[in-house]
Amino acid sequence: MTSFAQTLRNNATVPERILWSRLRGRQLGGFKFRRQRPIGPYICDFVCLSEKVIVELDGSQHVSEAGYDARRDAVLRSNGYRILRFWNEDVTRHLDTVLETIHAALFQGDMDGRFD
């Protein structure tokens, strides 16, 4: 699992690279994020372990994977994580809004789900 996570880190999509450039190094409110981090049997795009907030970026393929994503999210939520999902296009077109939403979620324990 760890070597696959490393492969994903080395082959990040453009939206993943854009978002990582703004999350890395505690740039967002001083919170530490990790990318392509294994949590249980899943690899999460980005996670702030201290706040148990997972950020997932979804491309067009996720429309057909909605059932898998729902099961995956349920397992992660049952372990205390909150999942924020954004479309890749949101990162490339509305990065500031995505960052504001993530920042707010780090301080508000009830934010969870898809943000369109």
State each model region's role.
Residues 1-32, 78, 107-116:
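Solvent-exposed, charged helical/coil patches
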Residues 7-13, 37-108:
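Basic, amphipathic alpha-helical patches used to engage nucleic acids or provide basic targeting signals
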